UniProtKB/Swiss-Prot annotation:
Role: Converts heme B (protoheme IX) to heme O by substitution of the vinyl group on carbon 2 of heme B porphyrin ring with a hydroxyethyl farnesyl side group.
Disulfide bonds: none
Protein's name in the database: Protoheme IX farnesyltransferase
Pathway the protein contributes to: Porphyrin-containing compound metabolism; heme O biosynthesis; heme O from protoheme: step 1/1
Top-level lineage group: Bacteria
Gene: ctaB
InterPro entries xref list: Protohaem_IX_farnesylTrfase, UbiA_prenyltransferase, UbiA_prenylTrfase_CS, UbiA_sf
Lineage: Bacteria, Bacillati, Cyanobacteriota, Cyanophyceae, Synechococcales
EC top class named in words: transferase
Record localization: Cell inner membrane
Range of residues in the leader sequence: none
Record field: catalytic activity: heme b + (2E,6E)-farnesyl diphosphate + H2O = Fe(II)-heme o + diphosphate
Organism: Prochlorococcus marinus subsp. pastoris (strain CCMP1986 / NIES-2087 / MED4)
Annotated EC: 2.5.1.141
GO biological process assignments: heme O biosynthetic process
Length: 332
């Protein structure tokens, strides 16, 4: 009995370190429902989509309108998600103190806020960017709320595999904001995020599998167990690494430096996945993989931005000249 209690306390401690309780990290109620922790990474991948185009860097007004519209749409999606899952959140100890279940905000207040953010996002993107960027942003919002939250999440263990399309749309928004169309490079980053999402999310789901099981949400670890889930994480992790390497062909220039800087990111990702494979129920290892996966995607987007600097272009030219010189020397 004592051993079980200690294990439960340990699991709770790990969860609190990864997904802090709202009691420990206080946010204003109106900000909490917008899920602001999710927005920075969405904006980072939007910037990544922009950096893959010939038009990078964008003018300041267009950049601000794109990121501002994306942030507003993401806030609206988060609020609508909270509205739909309000009854579910009441039943989980981890989420029962959120703004809606606890009564800090009313349903009507949050709904009006979500509608206002959606309209503001659409107006900002249409007036300051273009119709395609606005349409893709609203598609991302709808896919998160309708496809993932309402349709897939309560019905299938593959909810995040297909529902991950919502988180993969920002690169398309970034590319379309820059050029007026998406292009193959934008689709590459879209594909990378799609492959990265299951490995990222399932690492978190291992930590929260008991919470999901208690309310009947069929997350993969809750239904199939940690060992099965980690095998799936490994497959998606390797697919992510392979797709990330293809980024060298997606970049207009600076691909050589990108490829070199990418190596430690991929190495660390695979290392953490292998550690979790050796102990699928080790929550500390799941926590480590989850946290690194966030840094990994931020890192990829940063590498894309660095690769478009003059320093990277000069490095690529010098590398090519060195290669040609060595080739000529050995041929001689």
């Amino acid at each position: 009995m004592k051993s079980n209690l200690e294990n439960l306390n340990f699991q709770t401690s790990i969860r609190e370190q990864v997904v802090p309780s709202r009691k420990k990290v206080k946010l204003p109620a109106w900000l909490e429902v917008a899920k602001p922790r999710l927005i920075p990474l969405l904006l980072a991948t939007t910037l990544g989509g922009m950096a893959l185009t010939e038009e990078w860097p964008l003018s300041s007004p267009k950049l601000i309108c794109t990121l501002g519209g994306g942030a507003l749409a993401a806030a609206a999606a988060g609020a609508l998600n909270c509205l739909w899952e309000m009854d579910l959140d009441k039943r989980m100890k981890r989420t029962s103190d959120r703004a809606l279940p606890s009564g800090k905000l009313s349903f009507n207040t949050v709904f009006l806020g979500a509608v206002s953010c959606t309209l503001a996002a659409a107006m900002l993107l249409i007036s300051g960017v273009n119709y395609l960027a606005a349409g893709l942003t609203l598609l991302g919002l709808c896919s998160y709320v309708i496809l993932y939250t309402i349709i897939l999440k309560p019905r299938t263990t593959q909810n995040i595999v297909f529902g991950g399309v919502a988180g993969a749309i920002p690169p398309l928004v970034g590319a379309s904001a820059a050029t007026g169309h998406v292009g193959l490079s934008g689709w590459w980053l879209f594909s990378l995020v799609m492959l990265w999402t299951p490995a990222h999310f399932w690492a978190l789901a291992i930590l929260l599998k008991d919470d999901y099981a208690s309310v009947g949400i069929p997350m993969l670890p809750s239904v199939k167990g940690s060992e099965f889930t980690v095998k799936a994480i490994s497959r998606y992790g390797w697919a992510t690494v392979f797709m990330s390497i293809l980024g060298v062909f997606a970049l207009p220039e600076g691909g050589i430096l990108y490829l070199i800087m990418l190596l430690p990111f991929n190495g660390r990702l695979l290392q953490l996945i292998n550690r979790l494979k050796s102990s699928p129920d080790d929550l500390e290892k799941a926590k480590g993989l989850f946290r690194w996966s966030i840094l990994y995607m931020f890192g990829i987007c940063l590498l894309l931005l660095i690769s478009r600097t003059q320093l990277s272009v000069d490095f690529e030219h010098q590398s090519m000249q060195m290669f040609l010189s060595l080739k000529a020397y050995f041929n001689y």
